[in-house]
C-alpha cells in the first residue's frame, strides 16, 4: 500500500521543502492542481529536480487534448499524470497510451462520476494504472467520505490499482487502510498539520499496521 502527499496551497519552493521533510514516509508527492494553475508545469520540474526516492505526480485533471497534455507533464518530470474519469473514452485511451509510451503512469480521478461501478469497469478495460475515488473539497464540507465509493470501485475492477482521496487524516486513515486500497492520498492531513513529519509518520505507521 502506497502513501501519496498531495500539496495544493503552497508555492513550488515551499512544496519542495515540505516534500523533502516527509519523503521517508511517502511514496508519491503530488503537485496539486492549484499549484499547476498558479505556477505551471515548471513547478513539477522544480520538485522533480530537488527530491529523490519518490515519484512525482502532476494533478492536471485532464479533460481533452489528453496525449499532448500528458506528454507535456512527462517532459517536465511527472511520473504519474491525472485525467478526469468523466473525460471521453478516446481521451482516456490517448492518455494511457502516451503515459505508457514514456514508461509513466496514468491516474484517473473519479470526482463527479455518477455511476462509479460502470465507469470503473470501463477505465479498467482502457488500461488506467490507478482509479482514484475522490471526495472533493466541496463535498467534504458537507461531511461526505470516500469509503463507500472505495468499496464500490474495488468490487468491480481487476487490473487497475485503486486510490482513495478526500479529507483523510492521521486519525481517520485506519478506516481507509482497513479497506485495503493500493494508494492512499493525504493532503491537508499532512500538509496543514502542526507537525507534518509526525503526521506523515503516523499515516505510514497505520498503513504498516503499527
Curated annotation (Swiss-Prot):
Pfam families: OMPdecase. One of its GO terms (biological process) is L-ascorbic acid catabolic process. Its EC number is 4.1.2.43. It comes from Staphylococcus saprophyticus subsp. saprophyticus (strain ATCC 15305 / DSM 20229 / NCIMB 8711 / NCTC 7292 / S-41). This is 3-hexulose-6-phosphate synthase 1. CDD domains: KGPDC_HPS. SUPFAM superfamilies: Ribulose-phoshate binding barrel. InterPro entries: 3-hexulose-6-phosphate_synth, Aldolase_TIM, HPS/KGPDC, OMPdeCOase_dom, RibuloseP-bd_barrel. PANTHER family: 3-KETO-L-GULONATE-6-PHOSPHATE DECARBOXYLASE SGBH-RELATED.
